[in-house]
Every structure is written in C-alpha cells, then in structure tokens.
Regions:
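Patatin-like phospholipase
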Residues: 1-43, 53-380
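Gly/Ala-rich beta-loop-alpha elbow adjacent to hydrolase catalytic centers
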Residues: 44, 48
Length: 380
C-alpha cells in the first residue's frame, strides 16, 4: 500500500537551476530535518533532476551552489561547456550509496528515442529505480542531454532497472534526450502517487508552479548564464520564495503542524533580492541578441578566443582563430538569403503591378478610341 508523501518537483531550467538550488537550500535547512525520509520524495527534469537528486542523496546544497556558480567563468560564453560542468558536479558530489537513497524517492524525467514501426519517435519516461550509482549518474546526465549542446545523437543509458514506475522502458542501451517540458496533463511524472501533496518549482516562472520568480526570467539565461552576482541573487530569490510559500496559508497547510511551527519567519516582501530592473535588463539583452542573431556566433567565438589566450591554451586558440575566418560568412548568410528572397518577392510583385498598370492603360486607351470613333460616326 502506497503512502501519501510530500513531493517537491523541479522543472527543466538550464542555468536557472541556481534558483532551484535556493529553494532546495531552504528545504534542506528548515523542512527536511523535521520529516521522515519515507514521507518526502523528489522529482525533476534536466537541471531540476540534478537538484532533486542532490536533495534525495543528502548532498550539501550550499556547497553544491558554490561549485556550480564557480563554473561561470568557463561557461559564460560557451554553452557547450554547460553539460561537462554538470557531469563534473555529479561525479564530485554524488555519494557512493546515492542510488540507495534515491530508489523509490526520486523520479527523473527523460525523453526516450524509439525507432520502431507504428510508434512515436519521442516519448516521455520516468525512472525511479537505479541499479547502481553509475546508473544514477547516467540517468541524470541523460535528463540534461540537450540536443546539439550535448551532441546530435541521443545519450546512451546502459541499464534501466527492472523495477520501474509506470511508463518506464523495458530495454537496455536506450537512447535519451533532455526531459524538456512534458506537460503533466499528458504524462504524470511529477509524483509517485495521486495522493501525494505536490509542490512544483519553476526557475522560468511558469504560472502553474507553486514556487517561482515573481516575473519570467530571460530565456537566454538557460544557456548563457548571467554574472555571478546575478546567479547569487537567483539563489537568494529561490530561498526567499520558498520561505514565503511554505510559511503562507497556501503552502503551510500541506506541512505537518510540527514542521510549520518550526519554520522561521519569512523575509518581508519588499526585501526581494531580484529587482525588477535586473530582470528587465536581462530581457533587453535577449532582445538585442535576437535582433543581432547573425553576429552572436562570432561574438561568442571571439570571447572564447580571448579566454583561451588568457589561459595559455595556444593550440585550441589557433584552431578557433582559423574557424573565425569562416564565422562571418556563416553568420551573414541568413541576411543575404533574406535579402535575396525579399528582393525576388518584391520584384515579382512590382512586375505584376506594372503589368496590371500597363493593361489598365491599354484598356483605357482602347475605350477612349472606341468612344471617339462612335462620336465621329454619330456626327457624320
């Protein structure tokens, strides 16, 4: 017989999982010590799966946050380094018995790739049983496997345990992509049982989440992290938002009386660490990147080249410098293509208009000639 549990579910987030870490830090300090382990569960997708696994495995969240934000320097202008940084964190902090603590308490959302007749190519899958700590690491890495940034081919997971949640796979050596944003209405992946009390956490600010930023955060922060000071503001915002939600009437009723009484007073609303102007500045940055999209790849490549030269990595810098010779051509071709298509379309429209004008002129001339001939005939 299944027991009703308190389940915290973390959405896909990319670098915005720093907000998730702030929420997790509050839970680890003020909520989880007052709950029995079998009464609480976690679920997550992509970066949210890493945070959920950290809570299930008893990892020090504050120490993990310092490591994650410390990777900002090498990942700021190179989104391809985001997943190697995640692999490094998983290998460094996941305890040897992490799979034992996660079994039955952690659900990880994946996107399975199937090549079969009369079956969809992509589909959601939730994994909650882990054969070993290596298997747990593979599942977490697969849930973060963003296409292109992590590779074109799906990430291979060697083994899926025989005891699985509903909807899990039945095979070996399966290929997976990032868990992305599978709606809970289509696939019930967040909780273990329908009787569970669910708290949804979203770093992107989805309106259906229980704990979320007050305003939607800029989307490019998912792959291109903001400065470390802004990341620490995100961490503090997650901590404060969790405190306000769980201490309020909406979230407090879901907690046992002893847990709610032990919670510290939430911070005042006016002490929010994420000012509106900072979020607005991020959205303005995203708008600028969107307008100047053809110039973004060479810009990021130049910044990466400067960092490589600063670290003395001359061999990689030479390769990147040669690649920059082709980068402007690759970046300008969308503008050239748009210009050619627009010119062709406008030229065709102009030719049609000119033809219609000439036809109208000819028709008017013919009509006036006929009218003149009729008047001349009547006069005769």
């Amino acid at each position: 017989m299944s027991i009703s549990r308190l389940t915290f579910s973390f959405d896909s987030s990319g670098w915005l999982y720093v907000y998730h870490l702030g929420v997790a830090h509050y839970l680890q300090r003020h909520v989880l010590p007052h709950l029995e382990a079998e009464r609480v569960a976690f679920s997550g997708s992509s970066g949210g799966a890493l945070v959920a696994a950290a809570l299930a495995g008893g990892i020090d969240i504050e120490q993990l946050a310092h490591h994650v934000i410390g990777c900002h320097g090498r990942c700021r202008f190179n989104p391809f380094r985001m997943l190697p940084a995640a692999e490094e964190a998983i290998a460094k902090y996941m305890p040897p018995d992490g799979h034992l603590m996660a079994n039955g308490r952690l659900r990880v959302l994946l996107t399975r790739v199937r090549l079969a007749w009369m079956r969809p190519l992509f589909g959601p899958e939730a994994v909650s049983e882990f054969a070993s700590v290596a298997h747990l690491r593979q599942v977490l890495r697969a849930s973060c496997h963003i296409p292109v940034l992590g590779g074109v081919l799906p990430y291979q997971v060697d083994h899926i345990g025989t005891s699985r949640a509903r909807g899990a796979s039945r095979g070996y050596d399966a290929g997976y992509y990032d868990g992305v944003f599978w709606p809970s209405v289509l696939y019930m992946w967040r909780a273990f049982d329908a009787s569970d009390t669910l708290f949804k956490v979203s770093g992107l600010g989805w309106p259906t989440a229980h704990i979320r930023p007050p305003l939607p955060l800029p989307l490019h922060w998912v792959c291109l992290p903001p400065p470390p000071t802004t990341l620490w503001r995100l961490f503090a915002a997650g901590y404060d938002d969790a405190a306000r939600r769980l201490h309020g009437e909406g979230g407090g009723r879901a907690l046992p009386d002893g847990v709610r009484a032990a919670l510290p007073p939430p911070p005042p609303a006016h002490a929010a660490p994420m000012p509106v102007w900072l979020i607005a500045l991020g959205w303005a940055h995203l708008l600028l990147l969107t307008c100047l999209f053809p110039l973004v790849p060479p810009y990021l490549a130049c910044r990466e080249l400067l960092q490589l030269q600063g670290r003395g990595d001359s061999k990689t810098a030479v390769l990147l410098r040669r690649g920059l010779l082709l980068a402007p051509l690759l970046a300008i071709w969308p503008l050239v293509l748009a210009y050619l298509v627009t010119r062709w379309a406008c030229g065709r429209v102009l030719r049609e208009l000119i033809a219609l004008h000439d036809e109208g002129q000819a028709h008017a001339t013919a009509t006036s000639t006929r009218d003149a001939a009729r008047r001349e005939a009547k006069r005769i």
